[in-house]
Amino acid sequence: MKSPAPSRPQKMALIPACIFLCFAALSVQAEETPVTPQPPDILLGPLFNDVQNAKLFPDQKTFADAVPNSDPLMILADYRMQQNQSGFDLRHFVNVNFTLPKEGEKYVPPEGQSLREHIDGLWPVLTRSTENTEKWDSLLPLPEPYVVPGGRFREVYYWDSYFTMLGLAESGHWDKVADMVANFAHEIDTYGHIPNGNRSYYLSRSQPPFFALMVELLAQHEGDAALKQYLPQMQKEYAYWMDGVENLQAGQQEKRVVKLQDGTLLNRYWDDRDTPRPESWVEDIATAKSNPNRPATEIYRDLRSAAASGWDFSSRWMDNQHQLNTLRTTSIVPVDLNSLMFKMEKILARASKAAGDNAMANQYETLANARQKGIEKYMWNDQQGWYADYDLKSHKVRNQLTAAALFPLYVNAAAKDRANKMATATKTHLLQPGGLNTTSVKSGQQWDAPNGWAPLQWVATEGLQNYGQKEVAMDISWHFLTNVQHTYDREKKLVEKYDVSTTGTGGGGGEYPLQDGFGWTNGVTLKMLDLICPKEQPCDNVPATRPTVKSATTQPSTKEAQPTP
């Protein structure tokens, strides 16, 4: 007797079932995860709070990175005994009981270097190694050397690293690319996910999930062997992002997973803790106190979740675009995150096929197709003509255009006609003399106008090229590179972010001074230099005039062919 055709509810149930299979395959590994290191605000309790509130250091990150010289419980007991004694000096107590982080040696580049020479010379300067750390150090050890962004940062950061690795690959440092992939795989195996950075106080959240793209990058050099080698870690990271999905009812959210009323599964940013961030303790407390109409824990969670997004902070997350205390990151479903999840599912399908598991490859393809439909249905603003985030509170797509709207193009998830509209919107609303604006809002936050960030320039450039919009892509690359070159000519450094309303000016806003170095700017600059200059005539500095698209070199893409929506 012929079996009846499966009903629609059975088909919808396939999606959680696929994910559940991934969880089952990883259950043994999950049981081996060691105890999570405790962050300094938990280890030191009231002492940590008092030191940060006393503002002993200009940068709150300083004490978060300080290493206790003995058991933190003993230090805390001594503090409780001494703190109320006459003449107690908190700064002296800290100096005696902690080793404070040292400022790195200031790098002075040789005279007369071209932009390319300067970047190539920075790779060893930015390389760190922490195979072993002190027992109570907030720094988490990693087995291989890694490249830090630069400036105030002494640790590796998750999503920064992908764009840094693009530059390392462009410079031929495939050994460093392999080392960094191995480090992130180690973190997945050790902690169940890749934290924001290799610090104990970053373990409660991740960042934009680029690990699968890192493995795909390494596969350009090592072939499918890299995909097969790191398939278990990619699956485990996917399980982290989808954790809790099997118990979700329609209209519910659990940690990083959102299930809409029609069963569509999407993701959001989330931090497991709802306390002030140790590295920005005083600032977070002040933000929470400034809005007594909201529970402080809710604001702390949304601040932390915005840090997980990489966009800390932006009007993108706020109800009032000029008041940080109105941010509500956890009730927003980001278009860039879901584009990256789509890409992760596509790479998992490719890796599963390479490993000979066609059934699992088909499962991941099913998940990717379902997510793509969700992005097109819920994250396209037809009235405005651009992609945007989905609002869980209003149950509709938001109106604000941000550079995150280019991510569906970057991962080849956009419909062709919508990609064309995105090209128009980008040129009309975001393109500036110095590159691509992050948003059109001047809020004073660093992920808003007039700042432009290297990773978003590259995502936009690649995304537009994927859909044949090479002129707009060239405009973005050319404007941004000119900005980078002018700043380098004047200051002999590459910086974290740029003011794109002009050229030759570093960006402002944020919780700390402008940082130089700078990993992802170095990586994107090298990629763009090799994109705009012909292979037979590579350029070491940005050309004085805008190249024509005809003479520009189109690099081979590792992305899948553009799907039919």
Swiss-Prot record:
The active site is at 312 (proton donor/acceptor), 496 (proton donor/acceptor). Its EC number is 3.2.1.28. Its main location: periplasm. Substrate binds at residues 152, 159-160, 196, 205-207, 277-279, 310, 511. It comes from the Bacteria. GO terms for cellular component: periplasmic space. It holds the Pfam family Trehalase. GO terms for biological process: cellular hyperosmotic response; trehalose catabolic process. Belongs to the glycosyl hydrolase 37 family. InterPro entries: 6-hairpin_glycosidase_sf, 6hp_glycosidase-like_sf, Glyco_hydro_37, Glyco_hydro_37_CS, Trehalase_periplasmic. Monomer. It is found in: Periplasm. Provides the cells with the ability to utilize trehalose at high osmolarity by splitting it into glucose molecules that can subsequently be taken up by the phosphotransferase-mediated uptake system. The keyword Nucleotide-binding does not apply. Keywords: Glycosidase, Hydrolase, Periplasm, Signal. NCBIfam families: PRK13270.1, PRK13271.1. This is Periplasmic trehalase. It is an enzyme of class 3 (hydrolase). Residues 548-565 have a biased composition (Polar residues).
